[in-house]
Design a protein with these regions (language model features):
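Acidic/polar, glycine-enriched structural segments that form the non-catalytic walls/loops
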Residues: 27-38, 128-133, 144-379, 397-400, ...
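Extended ligand-binding clefts on enzyme/binding-domain cores
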Residues: 183-241, 347, 371-383, 389-396, ...
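Aromatic-lined ligand-binding clefts that engage carbohydrates, nucleic acids, or primary amines
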Residues: 746, 770, 778-804, 837
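Aromatic-rich carbohydrate-recognition surfaces in CAZymes
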Residues: 298-318, 376-491, 508-522, 526
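An extended acidic
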Residues: 38, 42-114, 200-237
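Aromatic-lined, polymer-binding surfaces characteristic
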Residues: 119-120, 340-360, 379, 412, ...
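Well-ordered alpha-helical scaffold segments within catalytic/enzyme domains
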Residues: 48-53, 73-75, 111, 142-147, ...
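An acidic-aromatic loop/edge-strand motif
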Residues: 711-733, 824-862
């Protein structure tokens, strides 16, 4: 009997070993993942730096928008200099790169040459169970050097960061300094002017707050603030003992801050050195006109506390990141194979980097995703819907964080429609919907889309928690939305859905499936709340609709794109929630039939979105791939995505909208929707429970929507009442902004000044030259001075003078009017009665516009 047991154990072990060997062999046959762009520093839509090349030395690093955000690293081995990161200095050769690995919290480059192996690791501790750490804007850059030839080597390294990382446009002036924090030293850079949360839009980078490059003085002996190109930089690269201070201010693209020092005298034992890259934005999001702090600042921490904590936690975080990466990658491999795991790691980094965690007035975590490279909207329902699987997987705090600010707005008096909103505004201003008809009318709204999204997501949170308590906070709104889908959901009218680039579509079959599942989810919520009558009503209705759907959408070996369009087809990605939420509304035959059709229909780089075009959506394919929960089906749809990533000619962060025949990007870069890649893990209830149960924060007790301040015109601008200004388009004398200047020879025209088609512009006088100078005398009552702010629309750089004193210098462009207090000198220059306002605006390209007024900003009533 014992011999039989030994034999059984031996056979079991042998089978396991053979399985692992086969798994390893299969992995060996898989080509390495070549990310279109490699994530290096991935925190939020502003602190997001990527390498758009196969090798770290083949291209300069960039912001996700493609604008230069240069990081450079050099190494000197036994007196010979080599590049590790960046293509500059071009006369310094690159150390050969031998490997690249992208993991959920780390990107690891390996280099070899001159008898040493060097790994350069970018660690962003995006640990989802620990929101305190996840929200910290700190990436650790670590060089680890090991000798390979039994010889001793003298190794020095540098890291350089461009001032561009702290500026929206390259010509913005930056100022820099160095500062000690205990045993740490930091080089610091930020814009001279700090327009906090002033700009909104898509192709925008941060120009407030400060970039920090911090290190232990025991590890790095030298620091430099220098010109980006010039002799001082060369001195630092040639002689690491030089310390150079730069005169401030300088243009952002002309500035570098650098640290350097000896790693060690390296033999065969690995030696490491680490620098922290951090960004303190102080305020991150404007929600209903209230500026919110980043979550890590909720208890009063500042940059000093951030850096000290980050330095103290490095070793423990390193271990935690290694453990997290290994465990998550193992779960991804088990769920979908090696290609899926690598795709998941890349998606994980990108998803969290396209949003921001902030604290509400109670210090509770809320988050806002950004619709990168589509229209810049913030808190968009049909963006956080595909993003949601990544947030749902890791627990209720993350899953609720983006719903709370959205639902507070949707349930407020401001949202007057019977369906869910589309968005909260334009990033980083979450001040109310801007898409389509906004709050004004139903033009280009997505009523069934957004309403179905919300009901499904509340159903998913209830599935995770086993109760509907969170839904109870917004029950009246959810009940209203369920009624809307009951009346309008089964056969949608001519309207947009999330795939709005494809245009309006009536009788959308996939949208109908979403509505049906939304109704089923609401029935489940009713059941969990103990309302059995409503639970039966909505569950029965959902089942009846599903049965009708199967009959009316049938088209032979598949189901249609639209009920009234035979011979058409589409991906039915919304069906995944039927199984994840255990609703069982649609028969399994639907998924099987669709999958068989998809597998014979897809192209080289993936399954098209529908029959109308060859383009596809990466996130939706990863959902569609899960429908049958068959591994062969799943891999059949995932493999072309992997091929696309490796072969697309577009070197930018992962797109979710591309052509399936030639792998070219159509649009959409670096969007959070790739969090949808994690949908496959939600089918495994044990895996979902494991990850969700680790939520340490378990947030609750969020504050209601903050009251909007009232903005009252004191000196109206053209958006309310055009006014007459004196203006000139030829450069005047230097005293043009002074109160005693004679502007009688200047022309007179109505505000605003610019060209038709400029976003948000109200044209009173055409201005189409590079520069314009404006003057106007205005009357300001004494009782309005206390809460007085400028009301500005500028495209591009403007200089605003108040009674001859420089009061504001807004840079770049905006797309609408906004309020901004004058600087301290400008406030001091204001007086009761008559005041002279003088403005200069400079234009370089595209639309152009300038207009200025004054408003009184009165706090809203609670």
């Amino acid at each position: 009997m014992k011999e039989n047991n030994r034999l059984a154990v031996f056979v079991t072990v042998l089978v396991a070993v053979l399985f692992l060997f086969q798994l390893h062999a299969a992995g060996q046959d898989i080509p390495p993942l070549r990310p279109p762009a490699v994530p290096l520093v991935t925190h939020d839509p502003y602190f997001s730096i990527w390498s758009p090349a196969d090798k770290l030395t083949d291209a300069d690093t960039v912001h996700w928008t493609g604008k230069p955000h240069r990081l450079t690293s050099l190494v000197r081995i036994d007196g010979k200099a080599f590049r590790l990161m960046g293509k500059d200095p071009a006369d310094v050769p690159a150390l050969p790169q031998t490997n690249l690995e992208v993991l959920p919290t780390r990107t690891i480059y390996t280099f070899e040459g001159e008898g040493v192996r060097l790994t350069l690791t970018f660690m962003t501790p995006a640990l989802p169970d620990d929101l305190e750490v996840l929200s910290r804007p700190v990436t650790y850059v670590t060089w680890t050097v090991q000798g390979l030839d039994q010889k001793t080597h003298d190794v020095w390294t540098t890291l350089e960061a461009s001032g561009e990382i702290a500026a929206n446009v390259p010509n913005q002036e930056v100022v820099s300094m160095t500062k000690d924090y205990g045993d740490l030293t930091a080089a610091i850079v930020g814009c001279r002017e700090q327009p906090v949360l002033e700009k909104k839009g898509d192709d925008i980078r941060i120009d407030w707050g400060h970039l920090f490059m911090a290190f232990r003085r025991a590890d790095f002996k030298t620091i430099a603030l220098s010109a980006a190109d010039g002799e001082k930089r060369k001195i630092f690269q040639d002689d690491f003992t030089s310390r150079v201070e730069l005169q401030n201010p300088v243009p952002a693209n002309s500035f570098l801050m650098s640290v350097g020092g000896q790693v060690s005298t390296v033999e065969n034992r690995p030696v490491s050195r680490t620098v922290m890259l951090a960004y303190d934005d102080k305020f991150s999001i404007q929600y209903m006109k209230k500026n919110l702090r980043p979550y890590w600042r909720r208890n009063g921490d500042d940059a000093a506390a951030l850096l000290k904590k980050a330095a103290a936690d490095y070793e423990s975080l390193k271990k935690r990141c290694e453990q997290f990466d290994a465990e998550l990658m193992a779960d991804l491999r088990k769920a979908g194979g090696e290609k899926y795991a690598r795709l998941g790691a890349l998606a994980y980094r990108q998803c969290f980097a396209a949003g921001k965690f902030v604290a509400d007035a109670n210090g509770k975590p809320i988050s806002f995703c950004k619709e990168n490279h589509s229209n810049g909207c913030i808190g968009t329902s049909d963006v956080f819907y595909p993003m949601a699987p990544q947030f749902l997987l890791f627990g209720p705090t993350l899953a609720k964080s983006f719903l709370v600010p959205f639902m507070n707005y949707a349930a407020s008096e401001r949202w007057k429609f019977p369906f869910a909103p589309h968005d909260l505004g334009t990033y980083p201003h979450a001040n109310g919907q801007v898409y389509g008809g906004g709050e004004r009318n139903e033009r280009d709204q997505m009523p069934v889309e957004e309403t179905g999204n919300l009901l499904i997501l509340f159903g998913a949170i209830a599935q995770m928690e086993g109760n509907a308590d969170f839904a109870g906070l917004y029950w009246a709104t959810l009940e209203k939305w369920a009624g809307y889908l009951k009346a309008k959901g089964f056969d949608p009218e001519n309207q947009l859905c999330t795939d709005d680039f494809a245009g309006h579509l009536a009788h959308n079959v996939n949208l109908s499936a979403k509505a049906i599942i939304g109704l089923g989810a609401f029935g489940k919520l009713c059941d969990l709340r103990g309302d059995k009558a409503k639970a039966v009503e909505y569950s029965k209705l959902a089942k009846e609709f599903a049965a009708r759907w199967v009959k009316e959408a049938a088209d032979g070996d598949h189901f249609r794109l639209a009920f009234d369009r035979p011979g058409t087809w589409s991906q039915k990605y919304n069906l995944i929630w039927d199984r994840i939420l255990d609703l069982n509304l649609f028969p399994a035959e639907v998924a099987r039939k669709e999958m068989e059709f998809y597998r014979k229909t897809q192209n080289t780089y993936g399954l098209p979105l529908d029959n109308r075009k060859d383009y596809t959506k990466l996130d939706w394919i990863t959902w569609t791939a899960t429908l049958t929960q068959n591994r062969a089906d799943f891999e059949a749809l995932i493999d072309p995505i992997y091929k696309f990533l490796n072969e697309t000619p577009n070197r930018s962060p992962m797109t979710d909208w591309y052509e399936t025949k030639n792998a070219k990007k159509v649009g959409f870069t670096a969007r959070p929707v790739v969090g949808g890649v994690f949908a496959q893990l939600l089918y495994d209830k044990a895996v979902w429970k494991k990850w969700a149960s680790r939520d340490k924060t378990k947030a609750s007790g969020w504050v209601p929507i903050p009251p909007m301040p009232e903005i009252k015109a004191v000196v109206p601008a053209a958006d309310r009442q055009p006014a007459l200004w004196r203006y000139a388009m030829e450069k005047p004398t230097d005293d043009w902004a002074k109160t005693g200047f004679d502007d009688a020879a200047w022309k007179e025209g109505k505000s605003g000044f610019g060209t038709e088609g400029t976003p948000g512009a109200v044209i009173g006088t055409v201005w189409n030259t590079p520069d314009i100078w404006l003057r106007r005398e205005v009357e300001i009552p004494a009782d309005k001075l206390k809460n007085l702010e400028l009301w500005i629309h500028h495209d591009e750089d403007a200089e605003i003078y108040i009674n001859g004193v420089a009061g504001a210098h807004p840079k770049g462009y905006v797309s609408d009017y906004f309020n901004r207090p004058p600087n301290a000198a400008g406030i001091a220059a204001l007086k009761p009665g008559k005041n002279l306002i003088a403005v200069h605006c400079h234009q370089t390209g595209g639309g152009q516009y300038i207009d200025v007024g004054f408003v009184e900003v009165v706090a809203g009533e609670k």
